[in-house]
Amino acid sequence: MEDGHSKTVEQSLNFFGTDGERGLTLDQIKTNQAKYGPNELPTEEGKSIWQLVLEQFDDLLVKILLLAAIISFVLALFEEHEETFTAFVEPLVILLILIANAVVGVWQERNAESAIEALKEYEPEMGKVIRQDKSGIQKVRAKEIVPGDLVEVSVGDKIPADIRLTHIYSTTIRIDQSILTGESVSVIKHTDAIPDPRAVNQDKKNILFSGTNVAAGKARGVVIGTGLSTAIGKIRTEMSETEEIKTPLQQKLDEFGEQLSKVISVICVAVWAINIGHFNDPAHGGSWIKGAIYYFKIAVALAVAAIPEGLPAVITTCLALGTRRMAKKNAIVRSLPSVETLGCTSVICSDKTGTLTTNQMSVSRMLIFEKVEGNDSSFLEFELTGSTYEPIGELFLGGQRVKASDYEALQELATVCIMCNDSAIDYNEFKAAFEKVGEATETALIVLAEKLNAFSVNKSGLDRRSNAIAARGEIETKWKKEFTLEFSRDRKSMSSYCTPLKASRLGTGPKLFVKGAPEGVLDRCTHARVGTSKVPLTSALKAKILALTGQYGTGRDTLRCLALAVADSPIRPEDMDLGDSTKFYQYEVNLTFVGVVGMLDPPRKEVFDAIVRCRAAGIRVIVITGDNKATAEAICRRIGVFTEEEDTTGKSYSGREFDDLSIAEQKAAVARSRLFSRVEPQHKSKIVEYLQGMNEISAMTGDGVNDAPALKKAEIGIAMGSGTAVAKSAAEMVLADDNFSSIVSAVEEGRAIYNNMKQFIRYLISSNIGEVVSIFLTAALGLPEALIPVQLLWVNLVTDGLPATALGFNPPDLDIMDKPPRKADEGLISGWLFFRYMAIGFYVGAATVGAAAWWFIASSEGPGLTYWQLTHHLSCLGGGDEFKGVDCKIFSDPKAMTMALSVLVTIEMLNAMNSLSENQSLISMPPWCNLWLIGSMALSFTLHFVILYVDVLSTVFQVTPLSAEEWITVMKFSIPVVLLDETLKFVARKIADVPDAVVDKW
């Protein structure tokens, strides 16, 4: 039933043909079960394990590697016997890499849809219904409840379906619907129709939402929605329809993979094609087919060389290290790729309550009368510090610190705060923090009384828990609460009837302590307390009080005000009808006004500075809240989202105002706004959608079930540590401390991680380009193999992998939060960066081939061949004067390959040092600024020596130990790479990479 809130009780019952006293008949129940289905959220049909496994191989680079492995395996079957073992190493290693990557991918996918399943925890198991087949109330399984059923709920019950209230049996019924609407205090419900068909969930005061909890009271209602037709069911539908989007890094790596695959294909075909003339060379036994296969193997080796197999592992390791650093800053990352996405966040959409504020209501101002002479009067206006539930704070009057015990009226005010109250504060030892037990507003009054300590209780030597209840304990020795007249909507107040336990300044008789909305309480006040005396309260004095509370409730503070009063001679309990709440108004009469307290959910101390940092970093902060517009704007001024005098026209919208705009106007509003108030979940999702259409990268915070679709849709969903399991499951990140400034720290960490990733990607790619150039040169020039596939895999995975991982520990640049966020569509490799890759890569390839050629031609320990002999080595077996005296086996001597491999490894270690910074010289950023890098370089060299000097490994990798002369030559070929990169960095600093300045568009 749509718009059930706008229908009267009778209309709602008639819609389903429900008897308001006896419920549905069995026939009606069966009909409705067939029509509407079971009252449950359907189980998500996940992908099978084999579907997930196959998806992991749906990637171009992976397909190329898989093809290379299959071809290598087939070719290995035709190898000569002595080479069979080494031939199988290459395809085996490639397959192991692919399997490891697939396992990680499947594991991540398996966790992806847990958010939808987490919604199940909000489904109640049982419900209490009234049906015509049995008399009285019967318990049934919640999934058997149908639209039209009469359901009864009471304190502690979980609402089993969306219910339109028809009757309230208690004074009031309060519902904790924070999981659905984000409201921090429980909501008082009623049975009246709400005529607005477009009312948001917060305003549907006659609807009990499925999955929410009854905080107080007892009521009956008719079910208007079950299963997917409930508010929580609609959220489930929205979440299941939300498509997962790839992170900017994943998109860039996909693009990079496509480009690389095209380049690989062209080079492989080119290498094979340019050697067609050598297919019949004597080295292949004069067989054209054997020659074709030989060069096909070289093409496969080229593919293996070009793909950075170690890149996925290094990226995963770097992101995992980033998550550990973020965890220390209270940001728990659930999705690894989102770590990098944080670095390009351009908009943070933040919830107000609990994220920008403490979510701990706190009294900041209060007033009492100083003097009253006729209509001439003056007030004492106090201010209090402290913004949490821990009762620590100072009392100020006119900027001067004062003691509450010096003001008699404050003793009475503190007494009203404690006695007219059903809440408390509790010390949570695990969290080492104070928490509310009951209503936030009442808890603020308890904390106020403790801060005031108006009766000067000695708190010295008390532990934190005892210190926090000392003033309450003192007041409760003076008064005993007999009963409470609960809050009701008609009078907007509550009161407690108390009797004295011992004599006090307030007299010896019973009192009725009252608190409530200022207008309602003042209407029933006849007198006012001034010190210890009591004076008549004229209409002029009432107007002055209301004018002051009006100021408190608007402007910068927008405080929630409560008036406190006392009935000095209350009506006797025996003359009260406590069973009829409509008569409570008659008992709260002849009141004496005591004072007004103004409270707010105060901003967190660190938020203002965090927003200043966001502005400096070019990040827009949009506050999205369920609060009313005036309160939200006041908080935004306090935290720096708006300046004190800034006109918010066109920058602040309520949910209703936003809905009234055309689509074009809505997009324009999202482009410039900084505040959306009184919003619903679909507003959040729509805002994210529009931001994504503008190529903005948005981080969205939330804590309730209602926030889950937007959290899932945003590039970065950020759930609160105190939030619901659904929100946490849908989010990429969880804030352990619910603190906005932790988001800013995480963004800074994300930027640093991206910079480091660029460095190690550059490092690995230049290495791969070097390997490709090496193989291309040997094939194009007709030289013997300088590097074989198993060596390339060793370099790509192990030797290069360790320094690449260590580059993830590079310290962040000092000006990292003074630059604008990078654009999501910014290429991973710019034109200038590509030129640098090619320049370094070409040198790596040339030096590697040059080292092998040096051993053949110029080494004192080598064969002393001519360049012509070397480039025509495949003709050696055919005889001829050109190869007279040359042993043709020398062309497959492992020494030349060892020289090439050693130069490649050494250059890569020096190149790792070059990658400490994109543009900073090694003079200004020396290697020891990252000790992890020095350690990894040492380990890589050690591993290289192991494969050279351990016989079994040297056989597998076809290498051999080098002499001192050969090592000196290796260094001569390697060191120039540092000079080349320093030159390129100098050019970049002066010309190519001038950073953009941050422009504050908002």
Curated annotation (Swiss-Prot):
GO MF, one example: ATP hydrolysis activity
Positions bound to Ca(2+) 1: 768, 771, 799-800, 908
Membrane-crossing residue ranges in chain numbering: 49-69, 90-110, 254-273, 296-313, 758-777, 788-808, 829-851, 898-917, 931-949, 965-985
Binding site for Ca(2+) 2: 304-305, 307, 309, 796, 800
One Pfam family of this chain: Hydrolase
Keyword annotations of the record: ATP-binding, Calcium, Calcium transport, Endoplasmic reticulum, Ion transport, Magnesium, Membrane, Metal-binding, Nucleotide-binding, Phosphoprotein, Sarcoplasmic reticulum, Translocase, Transmembrane, Transmembrane helix, Transport
Cytoplasmic compartment spans: 1-48, 111-253, 314-757, 809-828, 918-930, 986-1002
Domain of life, source organism: Eukaryota
Recorded GO CC terms: endoplasmic reticulum; sarcoplasmic reticulum; sarcoplasmic reticulum membrane
Active site: 351 (4-aspartylphosphate intermediate)
Topology in the lipid bilayer: Multi-pass membrane protein
Record's keyword annotation contains Calcium: yes
Segments on the Lumenal side according to the record's topology features: 70-89, 274-295, 778-787, 852-897, 950-964
Cell compartment(s), UniProt: Endoplasmic reticulum membrane; Sarcoplasmic reticulum membrane
Binding-site positions, Mg(2+): 703, 707
Protein's UniProt keywords contain Ion transport: yes
Catalyses which reaction(s): Ca(2+)(in) + ATP + H2O = Ca(2+)(out) + ADP + phosphate + H(+)
Main enzyme class: translocase
PANTHER family noted in UniProt: CALCIUM-TRANSPORTING ATPASE
Matching NCBIfam families: ATPase-IIA1_Ca (TIGR01116), ATPase_P-type (TIGR01494)
Family: Belongs to the cation transport ATPase (P-type) (TC 3.A.3) family.
Task performed by this protein: This magnesium-dependent enzyme catalyzes the hydrolysis of ATP coupled with the transport of calcium.
Name of this chain's protein: Calcium-transporting ATPase sarcoplasmic/endoplasmic reticulum type
Organism expressing this protein natively: Drosophila pseudoobscura pseudoobscura
